[in-house]
């Protein structure tokens, strides 16, 4: 059965009709052509599919599309503004915090949520925010450095 849904996607109103049981990941990738959100394991274990729902990280491979009615969804495509990378995206580039890049959208969105809640996290808080985001290439050290780099201007401002 199809559901007619209204929600905000990357800051813009969105209306869709989709089978209510389809996952948010399927709709983002297949219907809306937002392929930055990755399909990893399909079981919610790797978190490559992380998006923000009302500012909180969710595994879009587990979330039914019907859950987004009236809510705000943010994907990796919505972070850059006016052709300028989000500070976390820029920090990931500067720190070389990726190799194949498959896990990066999920990691960036998880840490965007962290920095909104806590603009000056310590290393333990960063690790906790990334818990479950699996990367088989980079070894995480540069990911931690990237999040610390993005948080640094906030720390200096305090």
Language model segments and positions:
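Signature of N-terminal electron-transfer/Fe-S-associated modules in redox systems
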Residues: 1-158
